[in-house]
Amino acid sequence: MEKYILSIDQGTTSSRAILFNQKGEIAGVAQREFKQYFPQSGWVEHDANEIWTSVLAVMTEVINENDVRADQIAGIGITNQRETTVVWDKHTGRPIYHAIVWQSRQTQSICSELKQQGYEQTFRDKTGLLLDPYFAGTKVKWILDNVEGAREKAENGDLLFGTIDTWLVWKLSGKAAHITDYSNASRTLMFNIHDLEWDDELLELLTVPKNMLPEVKPSSEIYGKTIDYHFYGQEVPIAGVAGDQQAALFGQACFECGDVKNTYGTGGFMLMNTGDKAVKSESGLLTTIAYGIDGKVNYALEGSIFVSGSAIQWLRDGLRMINSAPQSESYATRVDSTEGVYVVPAFVGLGTPYWDSEARGAIFGLTRGTEKEHFIRATLESLCYQTRDVMEAMSKDSGIDVQSLRVDGGAVKNNFIMQFQADIVNTSVERPEIQETTALGAAFLAGLAVGFWESKDDIAKNWKLEEKFDPKMDEGEREKLYRGWKKAVEATQVFKTE
């Protein structure tokens, strides 16, 4: 009887369940979208119960549609949209407020106040993160401050906090396990990444009671079992958890110090495994935990690009220059260059290494001869320039020259982007056969814990290269193009509307 690992990939717009066999191949996929809530400008929220029902639905569907029995599931791995915050009543199981999503800016005033009080460096030193609404800690404080009676309930021990992984494990285990893993804990602004425990000083600054917080566990461990009524009467081990970007790093088999992966999703996320060393960044990168496994924690440097694949959606839906995302490749390759056009897609500001929230998108170098093809090509190239910005920051901070870049996410199907990426960073770009690396990483973590795979070496054999893109551009051309990009970014930052 063939066994499988069931991976739950709980994302920002949809929940998916993916079955993996022992070769790391996909045996079935189910997906369900759920509603986004925007109660005020800049606020983004989800209904945590709706997320839970979407996860139940895709688990059921992937098993039923692929003629798999529940007793063929060797273990469950969970990967999740990071930072999104749920606070719920531990007796009723009901959330006391919507889940506040990682994108939501509703805690800006809390962050500003803590900065004004001089605590930014304290948070940076202990957590490796910036004091930003992106992370979970200020979201918990906001809920406790703004939901009537919440603070009193929390102090009485009646409320629980969790990121989405914690919420799902608690529900799947029938309220038995209130846990998170090192990678998710490291995104809360409340976890000391050096001492590997919740930090009392930070909790005091955020006024968050410690009794709300989950127990922090390794990323690969049996945390509990599914309660029988949620899983066809079976008690299946819940055995792997990691935040989405860290799961992708693991799914790309980036196990060695200096290994790097880049995800081209709605935004872009680059992570470098820095081994057992938490590298302090001087270049606007985040220091975070990659994963904890076998009693050992691996750290990572992370760079965030706010607009990556969403720039292609903008070409399609906003400007109507293309009918489908793949069409952008054929337009881009009809011309040999952009003829000096640069697109800086700072629609919501600039991420690493600039961290300029006030910058807005700009286009430079237009002439009467500029055509649609040049514009589309310049937009695609912007993904690659931003990636080089992050990679240079990583090399500078870590002292490691990146030897190859493993890639995943929707935009990696675009061969033009992959080749230009290799050219502009002067590094080989490796596209894997299985591009569902986030879900695969969660499956690998769960599989290790239940003995489905024996070791990381065993897993690395399952990583297969689909195509390698080697740099072909000469150095003079590469540096000239990149200098133009840096000038365009500088001009974008100078021009700001009031």
Curated annotation (Swiss-Prot):
It is an enzyme of class 2 (transferase). Glycerol binds at residues 82-83, 134, 244-245. Keywords: ATP-binding, Glycerol metabolism, Kinase, Nucleotide-binding, Phosphoprotein, Transferase. GO terms for biological process: glycerol catabolic process; glycerol metabolic process; glycerol-3-phosphate metabolic process. Activated by phosphorylation and inhibited by fructose 1,6-bisphosphate (FBP). Sn-glycerol 3-phosphate binds at residues 12, 82-83, 134, 244. ADP binds at residues 12, 16, 266, 309, 410, 414. ATP binds at residues 12-14, 266, 309, 313, 410. It catalyses: glycerol + ATP = sn-glycerol 3-phosphate + ADP + H(+). The keyword Phosphoprotein applies. Its EC number is 2.7.1.30. GO terms for molecular function: ATP binding; glycerol kinase activity. Pathway: Polyol metabolism; glycerol degradation via glycerol kinase pathway; sn-glycerol 3-phosphate from glycerol: step 1/1. GO terms for cellular component: cytosol. Homotetramer and homodimer (in equilibrium). Belongs to the FGGY kinase family. This is Glycerol kinase. The gene is glpK.
